[in-house]
């Protein structure tokens, strides 16, 4: 019986895996089994942290808006400010409001005066 040489498919798969894990430290970039485990772990972390990043930015925007509202001396809190925005049907999201709060506080002050009851 003649010897059958293995194909290139497994080698190609491992090469692709090795390129992905080349920046990992120690055995995580050298041994195939640990490379596979670390790749799965890295992709899970990336997937989880994409959602976390969205939550973190939303918290940051809310904090910035709240800080500027309290600094301006407006007599209501952040949640009442957002509630009044919705009642007056001003469609400004928190990202835009935070940018206005940082760059142009007088504009945010006029918005708050417009929606105040």
From Swiss-Prot:
Keywords: Chloroplast, Plastid, Ribonucleoprotein, Ribosomal protein, RNA-binding, rRNA-binding. PROSITE patterns: RIBOSOMAL_L20. It comes from Nasturtium officinale. SUPFAM superfamilies: Ribosomal protein L20. Pfam families: Ribosomal_L20. HAMAP family: Ribosomal_bL20. Belongs to the bacterial ribosomal protein bL20 family. This is Large ribosomal subunit protein bL20c. GO terms for molecular function: rRNA binding; structural constituent of ribosome. InterPro entries: Ribosomal_bL20, RIBOSOMAL_L20_CS, Ribosomal_protein_bL20_C. It is found in: Plastid, Chloroplast. The keyword Ribonucleoprotein applies. GO terms for biological process: ribosomal large subunit assembly; translation. GO terms for cellular component: chloroplast; ribonucleoprotein complex; ribosome. Signal peptide: none annotated. Its main location: plastid. Binds directly to 23S ribosomal RNA and is necessary for the in vitro assembly process of the 50S ribosomal subunit. It is not involved in the protein synthesizing functions of that subunit.
């Amino acid at each position: 019986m003649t010897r059958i040489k293995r194909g290139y498919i497994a080698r190609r798969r491992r090469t692709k895996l090795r390129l992905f894990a080349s920046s990992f430290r120690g055995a995580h970039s050298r041994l195939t089994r640990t490379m596979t485990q670390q790749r799965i772990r890295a992709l899970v972390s990336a997937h989880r942290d994409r959602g976390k990043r969205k939550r973190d930015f939303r918290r940051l925007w809310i904090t910035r808006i709240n800080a500027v509202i309290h600094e301006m001396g407006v007599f209501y809190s952040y949640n009442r400010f957002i509630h009044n925005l919705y009642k007056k049907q001003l469609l400004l999201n928190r990202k835009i409001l935070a940018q206005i709060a940082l760059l142009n506080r007088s504009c945010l002050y006029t918005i708050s005066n417009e929606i105040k009851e």
